[in-house]
């Protein structure tokens, strides 16, 4: 019998579209994982639309759901995956749950996308309350095993600015020293060796060699920029990175190549479809730019490698 691998995913939920748990659950299931989803919010659609309605789960309600799992003794997990959170007490409760689950299963891997803000034209801006930063820095990152910040979030967590690839590697080492063995800076403002049409991402993974010493693999990836604003890409990235690092635990290069290549196929299919719907010369709407997830099932399951990672 095939070994079951179960993920507890605590993220947002939308009725229409693909962000948060809606962007993470399908690819993880396609790749063979059982996914138990806790919806931190339930909205009609993502907040990039003109209107949205819905409810927000608070920390007491999260505790209640977790207590229900505990009472039935079904709170055994191999992975925890978290993304966007707006509330400090909710985030602290997530940390408590992760710590309890790790006591039960010391091999549990916590994958955290520390969603706090982004960089536009060199200027960084937070889109969560400022009081979340110390919680991420002091409580969340120390219990995380894999983190997927963008450049701005990596700078926030370490208090260091990144202007060069060398500085990015130093920041990733600082993040390692805070706890996680795998760090992927999912996007950066750094100029790619391939030119300004490319977006650069960087990764670093520490593994223990048979002799007990720590070995670090560092990689760089360059992805062709797409001129559109997608929502849910970070959630999809973190979910697929979880899956591919599980399948290639000591090879970040291969895990990232599969993750980024699958992302490429999903985004290309999405932009092609959005442009066909919007018509020539018309900017696609948020609804038209929803990720073409179901249509990309084969690419998620078995991505043709179109992005090669460079080992640094």
From Swiss-Prot:
Catalytic activity from the UniProt record: pyridoxal + ATP = pyridoxal 5'-phosphate + ADP + H(+); pyridoxamine + ATP = pyridoxamine 5'-phosphate + ADP + H(+); pyridoxine + ATP = pyridoxine 5'-phosphate + ADP + H(+)
Q: What is this protein called?
A: Pyridoxal kinase
Report residues binding pyridoxal 5'-phosphate: 47, 234-235
Q: Which UniProt keywords apply?
A: Acetylation, ATP-binding, Cytoplasm, Kinase, Magnesium, Metal-binding, Nucleotide-binding, Phosphoprotein, Sodium, Transferase, Zinc
Q: Where does Mg(2+) bind?
A: 118
Complex and partners: Homodimer.
Pathway(s) of this molecule: Cofactor metabolism; pyridoxal 5'-phosphate salvage; pyridoxal 5'-phosphate from pyridoxal: step 1/1; Cofactor metabolism; pyridoxal 5'-phosphate salvage; pyridoxine 5'-phosphate from pyridoxine: step 1/1; Cofactor metabolism; pyridoxal 5'-phosphate salvage; pyridoxamine 5'-phosphate from pyridoxamine: step 1/1
Q: Name one Pfam family in it.
A: Phos_pyr_kin
**Activity regulation summary:** Activity is increased in the presence of K(+)or Na(+).
Question: Phosphoserine modification sites?
Answer: 59, 213, 285
- Spell out the molecular function terms from Gene Ontology: ATP binding; metal ion binding; pyridoxal kinase activity
Species: Bos taurus
> Is Nuclease included in the keywords of this UniProt record?
no
GO annotation, biological process:
pyridoxal 5'-phosphate salvage
Give the sites modified to N-acetylmethionine. Answer: 1
Entry-linked InterPro entries = PM/HMP-P_kinase-1, PyrdxlKinase, Ribokinase-like
**Documented EC number(s):** 2.7.1.35
Name the source's superkingdom. Eukaryota
**Sequence similarity:** Belongs to the pyridoxine kinase family.
| Active site annotation, chain numbering | 235 (proton acceptor)
Which gene carries the instructions for this protein? Answer: PDXK
Cite the binding residues for ATP. Answer: 113, 150-153, 186-187, 226-228, 233
Chain positions recorded as Na(+) binding sites: 113, 148, 186
Where in the cell does this protein reside? Cytoplasm, Cytosol
Q: Which cofactor does it need?
A: Zn(2+); Mg(2+)
